[in-house]
């Protein structure tokens, strides 16, 4: 479990695996969670937080976001809202009626299932799961799937970045820190952030992604809180 806010958390070294020219040896680069959080928050920070936040909040209630509800929330005209929606990332999900059903969190099933307040939804990636509780001040029940073994990974994530009832206990999360803001898309960032049931299960992923980091779920939850706090400060 993580320590209280403001205190340093003793963490095992974060790993960055990189093969040499012969492909036989690996070098390990040590990065602090604070350094990773600073880089992540700078790249993940959106330019339309006042638009994205109500979308995320509504989806976590298990409901699509209608244009009418957004216009009311933002006090925006139809043309203004259409203009702003057009500026959202191209991977935002819409249903056939034109309602938003996915933006980081989604009503479209993925391998990352979340339950908050009795409402079920999904996320695009593992990092979205650990970012959500501190971002929205909620407790989340999580069930993900290891892409290698197909086995479930379950835990409870709290707003304070505490991880409860983790099973399997040695589960880890992969992460690739984007080099540029444009790299923070579902295809490039989200698809590389996964839960594995063990470091051994993640070995092949690390071999294929030499710039990937591997974190314990507790470390990942603490990182999620650091990023959420950073983005919140910048938004005020």
Residue ranges and their predicted role:
Residues 2-19, 121, 141, 151-236:
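Long, low-complexity, charge-rich intrinsically disordered regions
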Residues 23-52:
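Short alpha-helical segments that sit at the start of domains
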Residues 59-74:
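Short acidic, hydrophobic short linear motifs in intrinsically disordered regions
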Residues 73-89:
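Short amphipathic alpha-helical interaction segments
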